[in-house]
Amino acid sequence: MDLNSLPGIVPTSSINILTLSGIVGDSAFVELIVAGKLIFSDSFAVLDGALELWNFGDMVIDAAGDAVAPSCSIRVSADGGGLGVSFIAVVTRIDLDYEGKLPDFNSNFLDSSAVTLAPPGARTALAAVGSDIRETGLPPLSLSFVNDGSDMIPDSMLVEGKLSGAAAVYEFDLPEKPGLYRADLGHRHHFFLVAQLGEHHVIFCRNCMNAPEYIYLRAKVTLQRTRTVNSAMIGGRAKEYDMKLVSEYEVSASGLPESLFIPVSLLPSASSISIDGVPAAVSELKTQLSRESDELFECKFTATLSRNLLTPANAAARSRIFRTQFDPSFN
């Protein structure tokens, strides 16, 4: 990724290889700051006015601690001037090589992951079950702004819940202010990263070892076709609450780093896939080396997304966040 055009929110998997051009001089001094702490500093040789930096994403992961989205800065000083870039790094893909060092993404909400990216003001919902819900009724959920991915700010919003079967459902609008927010309900927690997503998409899945993986892609998504289906027939008649809208999309991405090749290649065989929080299936995946570099690759696949059309809880699914099926592993 080009350091000159680094976005304000970036996945750790995309900053393992950083390039910077237009540097005057034979060397440059580089510093990496994560959550206010200097993590790395060193001098690098400049070749033909360009600089290539490696493994910065791995260093952010090592320094993140319990922060799911730490604030970071990269400073480059050279003879011809300097550059300072600040951004939020999101740990979006769990690599087995780093198991044990990463934040614990498992939560006790009925959601596919403990980190959700969503646009400002989006209508969302979280649901939870458990003995504490049954014993205490409906405790309020607390939503707080998080500073630098770690320090809590006292001001918070309380959200009242509603019973839906055995679950407590909390529906609310996310704040308009971009940033990281934490939802707390007893021992449960969930993070919302509020940002203008643009062409960025988050894929969550469970790999062949049933371990959670998060893949963050900047991709072009083209709708191919939609159809309405009824997933259940009772007494020969379709029930309205089983009505679903099934959409097929062509997803194409280029300039992907080598570190994402294996996770992306294995998507068709992964389970519990969701794209931007919506349950999905991946098929017809094709990959090839990028024309730009042998260290980058391109991919194209068909994503089939299914959304429930009816019931209040499933209406929240259209905000791309609410998980419509119960997953006991999160409770």
Please tell me what each predicted stretch does.
Residues 2-17, 21-25, 126-142, 187-331:
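Extracellular/virion structural assembly segments
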Residues 1-200:
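Preference for solvent-exposed, low-hydrophobicity sequence contexts
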